[in-house]
């Protein structure tokens, strides 16, 4: 993605990041922001992981990450890679040999933290293994694994320390001839994360960045925190791939990712529901009506705008840019397309008629 001047809200593309391939998915350069998630099924359960991958793929996931906590999980990882419809990233901590084996067993990318993988000699083995099979590596750093000398420096802020740590590892890898790198430096605090990625974008303008707010929390708080931080970064042109990390079903992460990208007009997938917050003029159960429409459209991938309005004040006038919508009155709804009234229906039939008309688009 284009890196922009982080000091202004104006879009000012400076330089494209280096493109890497994660399986058949391009990441970086002029490629669109890649949406990804992480499996949370037991690492040894092949069927459960594959079922989750299929659900994620149907929800718009493009790359999926799988933790390999022990060497006895490698066989399961290989079987998942062989059958997965999505590229699978191996997430490895503490044991470099697992990363080496994962590269040989079908990983589309490796995710390591050089600070806990066992030192530079073991990092070398991982670089060699990835280089042999031609897959990229994501270097993920965090405050807990900073070099002690770097962590102790009082002249640097935490974002500067995280960026310096990542830059040091990038320099080392590139010095050994390995260039297919992606970098992340996530924190659970929104503005620490934003400042860190701004620093990374300045220090490593050629490196694709994986952005996210780590340990963001449960659905409501996690989506708010992630949208706040990632929205800032994406608007500034920072970020080549993203994950919204939630303590929830990973499929919920996909809905949040695509909603954010759509809100920023970066990518679109599936419908956008436009609905008013209701007021004393509303004479139908609009809250339930909007929820029904949203639920019925959950599996729709068509990028359309659907308006569900509580009265004639808000629709079709204020929702004129919607592809289709309904403006409700006393027990009735007026269905409109692009601001033009199509038909009037009873309240009990609004959802069915709206779905019927959407099917014609």
Indicate where each model-derived feature is located.
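Catalytic alpha/beta core domains of metabolic enzymes, predominantly
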Residues: 141-142, 150-299
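Hydrophobic faces of well-ordered beta-strands that scaffold small-molecule active sites
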Residues: 33-39, 62-66, 88-92, 110-112, ...
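Glycine-rich, proline-tolerant flexible connector loops at the mouths of alpha/beta enzymes
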Residues: 38-49, 57-84, 111-119, 181-190
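Hydrophobic or amphipathic alpha-helical targeting/insertion segments
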Residues: 97-138
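Active-site mouth loops of central-metabolism enzymes
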Residues: 30-48, 67-69, 86-94, 115, ...
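Glycine-enriched alpha-helix->loop->beta-strand junction motifs that scaffold or abut catalytic
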Residues: 83-86, 103-110, 131-134, 201-207, ...
């Amino acid at each position: 993605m284009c890196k922009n001047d982080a000091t202004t809200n104006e879009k000012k593309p400076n330089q494209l990041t280096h493109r890497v391939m994660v399986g058949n998915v391009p990441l970086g350069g002029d490629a669109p922001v890649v949406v990804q998630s992480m499996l949370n099924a037991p690492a040894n359960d092949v069927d459960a992981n594959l079922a989750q991958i299929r659900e994620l793929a149907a929800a718009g996931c493009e790359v999926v990450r799988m933790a390999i906590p022990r060497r006895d999980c490698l066989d399961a990882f290989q079987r998942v890679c062989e059958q997965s419809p999505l590229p699978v990233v191996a997430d490895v901590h503490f044991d470099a040999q697992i990363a080496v084996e994962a590269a040989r067993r079908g990983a589309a990318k490796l995710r390591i933290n050089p600070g806990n993988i066992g030192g530079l000699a073991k990092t070398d083995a991982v670089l060699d293994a990835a280089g042999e099979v031609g897959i990229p590596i994501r270097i993920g750093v965090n405050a807990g694994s900073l070099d002690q000398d770097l962590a102790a420096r009082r002249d640097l802020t935490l974002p500067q320390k995280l960026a310096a740590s990542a830059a040091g590892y990038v320099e080392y890898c590139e010095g050994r001839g390995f260039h297919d790198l992606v970098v992340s430096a996530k924190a659970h605090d929104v503005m620490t994360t934003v400042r860190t990625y701004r620093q990374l974008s300045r220090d490593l303008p050629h490196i694709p960045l994986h952005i996210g707010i780590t340990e963001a929390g449960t659905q409501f708080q996690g989506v708010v925190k992630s949208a706040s931080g990632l929205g800032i970064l994406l608007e500034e042109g920072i970020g080549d791939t993203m994950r919204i990390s939630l303590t929830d079903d990973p499929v919920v992460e996909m809905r949040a990712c695509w909603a954010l990208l759509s809100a920023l007009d970066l990518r679109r997938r599936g419908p956008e529901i436009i609905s008013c917050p209701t007021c004393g003029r509303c004479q139908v159960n609009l809250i339930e009506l909007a929820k029904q429409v949203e639920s019925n459209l959950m599996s729709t991938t068509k990028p359309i705008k659907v308006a569900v309005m509580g009265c004639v004040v808000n629709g079709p006038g204020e929702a004129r840019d919607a592809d289709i919508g309904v403006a409700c009155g006393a027990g009735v709804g007026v269905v409109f397309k692009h601001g033009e009234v199509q038909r009037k229906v009873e309240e009990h039939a609004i959802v069915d008629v709206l779905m019927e008309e959407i099917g014609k688009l």
